[in-house]
Amino acid sequence: MTWLEIVVLALIQGLTEFLPISSSAHLILPSEVWGWQDQGLAFDVAVHVGTLLAVMVYFRADIFNLLNGWIKQITGGGASQESRLAWAVILGTIPACVAGLLLDSWIEENLRSALVIALTTIGFGVLLGMADRKEGTRDIDQFTLKDALIIGVSQALALIPGTSRSGITMTSALFLGLNRDTAARFSFLLSIPLIAAAGLFKGLELADTGTSSQWSEIAGATLISAVSAYACIHLFLKFLQKIGFMPFVIYRMLLGAGLLVWLYVA
């Protein structure tokens, strides 16, 4: 990979991982549209580590409180809002992990294409727009384990390129009557174990291949994806209540339509 490709792809990962527009779709597109070579496992691991660091640093206080509440409960203490939310994150993670283990290889072989990305980008964009119009008023205090399970099941759909993990989880949360801030924050917290698991899986796969890598390139990709992801999370949460999800819906419509036109012309 050239440094231009590293910078562009790491920025794409960092800026799209937590926005409802699908990071996997945007990482596939350069190879489909520009003919860039696949970035490889080492790069995938690097940008996963970068985005994981970003979300963990940003939500470090929340993570500490959730872990503290969860540990207190399982060691004999009483239940709390923090322990309940920790269980919600655990419960919401299970469906996507199971689906990933069972279906990831099949999806990679059969659904990793520009046409699938175009259709899912448009289809799930429409759902996000409908959900945003239905935004509820429930906050984190009214969040239930049933909500977590439903959102977790929907998260499994993000294995399909173009769906967007953050997009589908926020869509489900909004349909359940949660407000925008709660939908976004739970989606970000829910991303932590999944990104960690994906990074670990790819890391083990990389170790098995014995592929040598340029550490400067890995460090650069990690740093760029981490900084851009952190900035993206901060700005997204800052402006979400003002702008809602419609700018992302419009972007998805334009991207999907543009891809369909490109496929037709090509």
Swiss-Prot record:
Pfam families cross-referenced by the UniProt entry: BacA
GO biological process, one term: regulation of cell shape
Compartments in which it is found: Cell inner membrane
Residues passing through the membrane, by range: 1-21, 39-59, 87-107, 111-131, 143-163, 186-206, 217-237, 243-263
Alphabetized GO MF terms: undecaprenyl-diphosphatase activity
InterPro entries: UppP
Keyword Cell wall biogenesis/degradation: yes
Record-listed E.C. numbers: 3.6.1.27
Cellular component annotations (GO), alphabetically ordered: plasma membrane
Record key words, sorted: Antibiotic resistance, Cell inner membrane, Cell membrane, Cell shape, Cell wall biogenesis/degradation, Hydrolase, Membrane, Peptidoglycan synthesis, Transmembrane, Transmembrane helix
Keyword Transmembrane helix: yes
Topology class, membrane: Multi-pass membrane protein
Leftover remarks: Bacitracin is thought to be involved in the inhibition of peptidoglycan synthesis by sequestering undecaprenyl diphosphate, thereby reducing the pool of lipid carrier available.
Family to which the UniProt record says this protein belongs: Belongs to the UppP family.
Function, as annotated: Catalyzes the dephosphorylation of undecaprenyl diphosphate (UPP). Confers resistance to bacitracin.
Matching HAMAP family: Undec_diphosphatase
Name of the protein: Undecaprenyl-diphosphatase
Organism: Hahella chejuensis (strain KCTC 2396)
